[in-house]
A protein has these predicted regions:
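Surface-exposed loop/turn segments and immediately adjacent short secondary-structure elements
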Residues: 1-134, 139, 143-147, 166, ...
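Conserved polymerase palm-domain catalytic core
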Residues: 207-260
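Conserved short loop/turn motifs at secondary-structure junctions
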Residues: 81-90, 170-175, 204-210
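Alpha-helical recognition domains of nuclear gene-regulatory proteins
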Residues: 21, 67-70, 85-86, 101-104, ...
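Conserved catalytic palm subdomain of right-hand nucleotidyl-transferase polymerases, strongest
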Residues: 74-82, 120, 131-140, 181-224
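Conserved pre-motif C helix in the palm subdomain of viral-like polymerases
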Residues: 26, 133-162, 181, 208-211
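Electropositive, glycine- and tryptophan-enriched low-complexity nucleic-acid-binding patches
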Residues: 150, 157-173, 255-256
Length: 260
């Protein structure tokens, strides 16, 4: 449905409606949130200031080869229409070129704009199929973008693990940790408290569009606290800014919009 609640069936028009809706989700939710009553900086763990500085480092050809081997060929192609299978099949000849591009990006703290374009496919979750809010946006990125992202994420994770920045209670987005481990930890705590005749209370939260509502300014300030260098912060700022997307319905594409 459009803004006047009129049902639209033209694929091009539908793609435009979806794109406008998806690109404004984070902003609309953030504006609806009440202003914080406390300064977020008071929650920082001050001992973390003792660890060394973090900066992205250059990578070798073998690292590119290993990443290409790990990519699934079942993933759809992104905006650049470069299939992952083509990269994997030619990994030994393409790895030096890709390593050069990645290292140039790291040296200049620039994430290329063409790698920040997402092709979005709406996936119906449940409920009224004419209501945009009942769809989940599936963003399909460039295969080369995924390679660069994996490299950056691996370096950040390694730094956080080595310097024990992650709380031991975090199980998501960490190697050798999963939901099973989180449940086991919970059950262990419950068992210990039960045997000690203690009362246990739990709070379970499901944040709506959590990643879409992250305040990038606060994120960068947290990186400053964790001793990220100016170059590394500039790189992440570049990665987060000027991201564009278009929605594809059948074979009709919307215009490009910048994520807010």
């Amino acid at each position: 449905k459009d803004d006047q609640q009129k049902v639209i069936d033209d694929p091009k028009a539908v793609s435009e409606i979806f794109n406008k809706f998806f690109t404004n989700i984070g902003t609309n939710l953030s504006m609806a949130l009440p202003p914080p009553k406390t300064d977020f900086r008071q929650y920082f763990d001050l001992p973390n200031l003792q660890h060394p500085k973090f900066d992205f480092h250059l990578i070798g050809v073998q690292e590119i080869i290993d990443i290409l081997k790990s990519l699934s060929i079942k993933k759809s192609t992104g905006y650049d229409k470069i299939p992952i299978k083509a990269l994997k099949d030619n990994k030994y000849s393409l790895a030096p070129v890709l390593a050069y591009i990645v290292n140039l990006s790291i040296q200049n703290s620039v994430f290329p704009d063409l790698l920040k374009v997402a092709r979005v496919k709406p996936l119906h979750k449940k409920g009224d199929p004419t209501n945009c809010s009942n769809y989940r946006p599936i963003s399909i990125l460039s295969a080369i973008s995924k390679i660069l992202e994996k490299i950056l994420a691996a370096q950040i994770n390694e730094f956080f693990e080595e310097n024990q920045i992650f709380t031991d209670s975090q199980f998501g987005f960490r190697k050798c940790r999963n939901t099973t481990g989180a449940i086991n930890r919970l059950m262990e705590d419950l068992y210990i408290n039960f045997n000690s005749s203690k009362i246990t209370q739990g709070i379970f939260l499901d944040f709506s569009k959590a990643f879409d509502t992250i305040d990038h300014d606060i994120l960068i300030q947290k990186l400053t606290f964790y001793n990220f260098t100016d170059n590394s912060k500039d790189f992440i700022k570049c990665y987060l800014s000027n991201r564009k997307q278009f929605v594809q319905i059948n074979h009709a594409n919307s215009s490009f919009l910048t994520l807010k």
